[in-house]
């Protein structure tokens, strides 16, 4: 582990290292400007994962996250959540470990998994999930928020995840009845002492990291407020307390949502894990 107290020290440490780093964590308060170091670091180590650590809002900086391929922002809490810190950095280094709702829950937990291949499956699963969530959320407004986010993820997987050989989307909203043989959407829902959670995974892996980053940037910065594409991910991020995007190209795409039992999360983290 190499540490630095300012940009000058950080640059010197990076330049004097003869082996690639596994990952780099940069405090947003690194003086005088953390992105001065990141820009220099990216020239020497273009593929090393970089994460930011911050206690303040960072969404205005999203274009810089996109520019420098920063796919994780860890929110500093008091006390610091070392489990969250360790898991996030491990996910960046070993992205195959990032998949699955259980990765983000702690024992003791409850976890349910269901496969969706038809509209009937989707409707039955959603009713089962809502009954589960109602055990922990007595207010209809909370349930409506979770349901909206969960359904948005499932719809995104069905209507945007499956494509024809031409690249065109295979299933149309309002016309979907059943996936073709070999296609499936896997959903999970569960809880631990801190969160309710859900995940949606398609077995196509058509989600593209650069497209995801650009769409989120346009929505977060309000440049794409009228865009028809990209609203789904932005909506689910807004409705949840934590969102994790996991991509294994041509294999599977997954989004995990977490909803805190205590709504004290003021700054939302950012997690995007990509298997190269």
Question: Language model features by range: what are they?
Answer:
Residues 152-156:
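Conserved polar catalytic motif of the HATPase_c/GHKL fold
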Residues 87-148, 159, 163, 268-276:
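Bergerat-fold GHKL ATPase/HATPase_c domain
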Residues 60, 77-89:
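C-terminal output helix
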Residues 3-23, 31:
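Acidic, metal-coordinating helix/loop segments flanking the phosphotransfer/catalytic sites
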Residues 32-36, 40, 45, 55-75:
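Alpha4 helix (beta4-alpha4-beta5 surface) of REC/receiver domains from two-component response regulators
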Residues 20-22, 44-51:
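His-Asp phosphorelay/catalytic-motif detector in bacterial-type signaling
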Residues 105-110, 158-276:
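Conserved beta-strand-loop-beta-strand hairpin that lines the nucleotide-binding pocket
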Residues 24, 50, 73-75:
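Two-component signal transduction core modules
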């Amino acid at each position: 582990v190499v540490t630095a107290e300012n940009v000058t020290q950080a640059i010197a440490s990076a330049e004097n290292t003869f082996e690639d780093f596994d990952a780099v964590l940069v405090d947003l308060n690194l003086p005088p400007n953390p992105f001065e170091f990141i820009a220099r670091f990216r020239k020497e180590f273009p593929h090393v994962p970089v994460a930011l650590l911050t206690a303040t809002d960072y969404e205005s900086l999203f274009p810089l996250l996109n520019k420098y391929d920063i796919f994780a922002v860890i929110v500093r809490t008091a006390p610091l959540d070392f489990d969250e810190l360790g898991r996030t950095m491990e996910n960046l280094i070993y992205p195959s470990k990032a998949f699955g709702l259980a990765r983000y829950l702690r024992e003791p937990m409850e976890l349910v998994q269901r496969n969706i291949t038809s509209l009937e499956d989707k409707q039955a699963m959603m009713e089962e999930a809502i009954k589960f969530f109602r055990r922990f959320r007595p207010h209809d407004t909370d349930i409506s928020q979770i349901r909206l986010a969960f359904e948005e993820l499932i719809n995104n997987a069905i209507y945007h995840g499956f494509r024809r050989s031409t690249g065109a989307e295979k299933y149309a909203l309002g016309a979907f009845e059943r996936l073709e043989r070999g296609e499936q959407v896997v959903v999970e829902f569960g809880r631990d002492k801190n969160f309710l959670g859900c995940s949606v995974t398609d077995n196509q892996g058509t989600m593209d990291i650069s497209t995801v980053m650009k769409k989120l940037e346009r929505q977060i910065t309000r440049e794409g407020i009228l865009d028809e594409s990209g609203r789904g991910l932005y909506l689910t991020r807004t409705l949840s307390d934590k969102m994790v995007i996991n991509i294994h190209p041509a294999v599977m795409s997954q989004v995990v949502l977490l909803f805190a039992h205590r709504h004290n999360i003021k700054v939302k983290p950012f997690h995007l894990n990509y298997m190269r």
